[in-house]
């Protein structure tokens, strides 16, 4: 994905602020170069569950299930400093996976930047997922994952989250809005209870009934599994939709 002028401006502003807050940090010039295509695969080893963190500063993230390993990913980028950093450790029977965009604060980009991640996670391992997004577009298809928890922090751009899976266990999902638009698709066959707190933006609820300070779907209180969603609005728009 080519980063739009608007998102590019936000990215440069964020980088400038990060540099200003760093300790005596001077800016460095980052040029746009040739496209680099890289693949990563992570073996779960003996982990019985995993905490996975994805931290992307700018670009396009497509996250799905279907990996035979713990994670299988393809990365394309043309700013050398943005090379993704992947780490994985196992403590006891729990794995800790971190995928983070490289690069330091206080940098100035020149040229047309490109950064695309295609990440696939394992469907069988219970996964506590943390996604931190900056500027760009993200498509998170999480319906096949064995989610144990979700924390999503959005930046500037457009994000779609698919939580329509037939989940085997209840879990909490926390969604923090940013600047832009987010659509969260929710299941009809699994109980959903959503609490939304405002910001400067707008929160829309489709297919959900207002009960007190919460929104619930028709399956709430009837199914063995409940998806508890906490939404903190930002400057943009968040759409909750039962499908």
Stretches with model-predicted labels:
Residues 1-8:
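Bacterial N-terminal signal peptides that target proteins for export
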Residues 17-20:
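C-terminal motif of bacterial Sec signal peptides marking the signal peptidase cleavage site
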Residues 22-24:
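Bacterial signal peptide processing site
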Residues 34, 43-65:
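Post-signal-peptide N-terminal segment of Sec-exported extracytoplasmic proteins
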Residues 36-45, 73-110, 158-243:
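Short, surface-exposed interaction patches in beta-rich subdomains
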Residues 58-59, 67-80, 117:
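N-terminal beta-strand/beta-hairpin edge segment
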Residues 106-122:
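Extended Gly/Ser/Thr-rich low-complexity repeat segments
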Residues 122-126, 132-135, 142-149, 153-156, ...:
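Extended beta-solenoid/beta-helix repeat architectures
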């Amino acid at each position: 994905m080519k980063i739009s002028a608007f998102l590019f401006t936000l990215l440069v502003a964020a980088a400038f602020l990060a540099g200003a807050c760093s300790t005596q940090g001077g800016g460095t010039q980052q040029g746009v170069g040739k496209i680099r295509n890289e693949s990563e695969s992570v073996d779960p080893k003996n982990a019985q569950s995993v905490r996975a963190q994805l931290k992307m500063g700018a670009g396009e993230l497509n996250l799905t299930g279907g990996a035979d390993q713990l994670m299988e990913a393809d990365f394309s980028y043309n700013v050398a400093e943005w090379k993704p950093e992947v780490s994985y450790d196992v403590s006891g029977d729990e794995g800790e996976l971190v995928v983070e965009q490289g690069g330091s604060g206080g940098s100035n980009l020149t040229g047309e930047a490109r950064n695309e991640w295609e990440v696939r996670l394992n469907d069988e391992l219970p996964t506590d997922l943390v996604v931190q997004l900056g500027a760009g577009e993200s498509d998170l298809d999480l319906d096949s994952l064995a989610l144990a928890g979700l924390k999503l922090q959005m930046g500037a751009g457009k994000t779609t989250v698919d939580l329509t899976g037939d989940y085997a266990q209840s879990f909490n999902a926390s969604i923090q809005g940013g600047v832009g638009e987010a659509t969260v698709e929710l299941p009809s066959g699994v109980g959903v209870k959503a609490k939304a707190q405002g910001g400067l933006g707008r929160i829309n609820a489709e297919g959900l009934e207002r009960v007190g300070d919460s929104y619930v779907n028709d399956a709430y209180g009837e199914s063995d599994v409940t998806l508890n969603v906490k939404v903190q609005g930002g400057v943009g728009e968040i759409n909750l939709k039962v499908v």
